[in-house]
């Protein structure tokens, strides 16, 4: 294999590998996954970011030292941040508040200014991320709103790079391509190129349940928008760049199916990809299994799963969202979000130092820990206990937890009635749930609300 020398990180964008999947049930079909997660910014949106910035420079819309503003669910922002850092542009990104923390940390590490806005409002609301970004661009002197949703350089990136790469990799023999739609650039660009070079190639839409796009494909109409957790695809409006009239079939994919499929992809094929990949792969597998003759089908690993480790690949988060079902016991243990017998509860021992406890609190983003001795709860320590006992003296961080913890602990047997749990929570306390004397876990008000919500969802 010839190893190439590159002179800029932007030279690494594109020419991503194509992997045939062998360990998933693809029916009579051959299913290929284009590994866009191998781009330097970690997603297919690197292609779009490079194309849009280059075209803006060519048209004189961006001058050295200029400011770029964009609305993004994350990956376009990462691509823009990567290129903006190389070209010394200031970048301001408006992002929905459902974006993973890893993406936000990555964006800020690249030097971007990240402004969070609501993800529970629709287009036309002043807090909607696209409306917010457009307004911000109007108010910022010399700023260029790159506007991926209406920027022709977006689909151009796929018509000039992604499409011919696929065609070459599969020697011109592609029966179907499964895509998702966020801005619509991938679908629009691929369709434009394949219509000319491979008219037989069908386009399949993978759409998160709650998005309106699958309805538009199936019926030409759409109703009210729902909500979904998958990031980067699905919309509450029809993106101008999306050529939905050319879509052959649309599949609606729930968050549960998408997340489990992405996790399965990692477990059986070794590919760490993000939540939108789970949506695309779920639809691709359904399409493949529905065929009566062999076909060559392509879909995408849209981005890297390393941005979803705290969410989709975190069992505790998945349970809290109701995406991993835990068998109900019919007692108070059903309200425990982080169970001790599953290794999910962060605990302390009486002889641990306050410094060690504080480190655990910061590491796991929690404010209190149960203190265990021989499997029994002997106290609870929280941030206020640390404040009262340290009192600005760093030396006191070496004190043992036993000197700072609260020994007044409300312990409920798991067989107690829910009314007793509610009585404890009504007093602003945390309930300790036990099986006889064996500690099972803590229950907070938030845990109760989460359990109730998940019961409704199921």
PLM segments and residue spans:
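Short glycine/proline-centered loop/turn elements that form peptide/ligand docking sites
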Residues: 98-101, 344-345, 354
């Amino acid at each position: 294999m010839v190893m190439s020398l590159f002179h800029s990180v932007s030279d690494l964008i594109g020419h991503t590998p194509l992997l045939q999947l062998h360990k998933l049930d693809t029916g009579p079909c051959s299913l290929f996954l284009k590994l866009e997660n191998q781009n330097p910014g970690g997603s297919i949106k690197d292609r779009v970011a490079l194309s849009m910035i280059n075209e803006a420079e060519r048209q004189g819309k961006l001058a050295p030292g200029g400011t770029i503003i964009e609305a993004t669910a994350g990956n376009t922002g990462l691509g823009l941040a990567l290129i903006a850092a190389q070209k010394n542009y200031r970048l301001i990104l408006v992002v929905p508040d459902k974006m993973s923390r890893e993406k936000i940390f990555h964006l800020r590490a690249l030097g971007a200014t990240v402004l969070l806005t609501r993800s529970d409002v629709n287009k036309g609301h002043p807090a909607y991320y696209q409306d917010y970004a457009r307004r911000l661009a109007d108010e910022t002197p010399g700023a260029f709103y790159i506007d991926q949703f209406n920027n022709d350089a977006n689909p151009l990136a796929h018509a000039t790079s992604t499409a011919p790469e696929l065609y070459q990799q599969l020697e011109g023999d592609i029966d179907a391509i499964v895509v998702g739609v966020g801005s619509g650039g991938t679908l629009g660009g691929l369709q434009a190129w394949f219509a000319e070079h491979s008219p037989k190639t069908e386009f399949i839409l993978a759409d998160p349940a709650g998005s309106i796009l699958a309805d538009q494909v199936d019926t030409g109409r759409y109703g009210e928008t729902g909500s979904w957790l998958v990031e980067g695809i699905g919309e509450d409006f029809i993106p101008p760049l999306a050529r939905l009239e050319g879509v052959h079939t649309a599949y609606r994919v729930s968050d549960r199916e998408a997340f489990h499929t992405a996790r399965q992809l990692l477990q059986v094929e070794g590919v760490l990809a993000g939540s939108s990949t789970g949506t695309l792969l779920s639809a691709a597998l359904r399409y493949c299994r529905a065929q009566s003759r062999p076909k060559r089908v392509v879909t995408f690993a849209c981005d890297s799963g390393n941005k979803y480790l705290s969410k989709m690949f975190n069992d505790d988060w998945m349970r809290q969202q109701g995406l991993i079902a835990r068998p109900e016991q019919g007692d108070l243990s059903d309200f425990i979000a982080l169970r001790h017998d599953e290794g999910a509860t962060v605990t302390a021992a009486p002889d641990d130092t306050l410094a060690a406890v504080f480190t655990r609190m910061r590491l796991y983003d929690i404010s209190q820990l149960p203190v265990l001795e021989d499997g029994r709860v002997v106290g609870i320590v929280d941030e206020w206990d640390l404040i009262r006992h340290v009192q600005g003296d760093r030396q006191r961080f070496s004190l043992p937890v036993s000197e700072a913890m609260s020994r007044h602990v409300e312990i409920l047997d798991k067989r107690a009635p829910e009314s007793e749990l509610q009585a404890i929570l009504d007093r602003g306390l945390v309930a300790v749930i036990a099986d006889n004397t064996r500690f099972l876990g803590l229950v907070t008000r938030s845990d109760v609300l989460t359990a109730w919500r998940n019961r409704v969802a199921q």
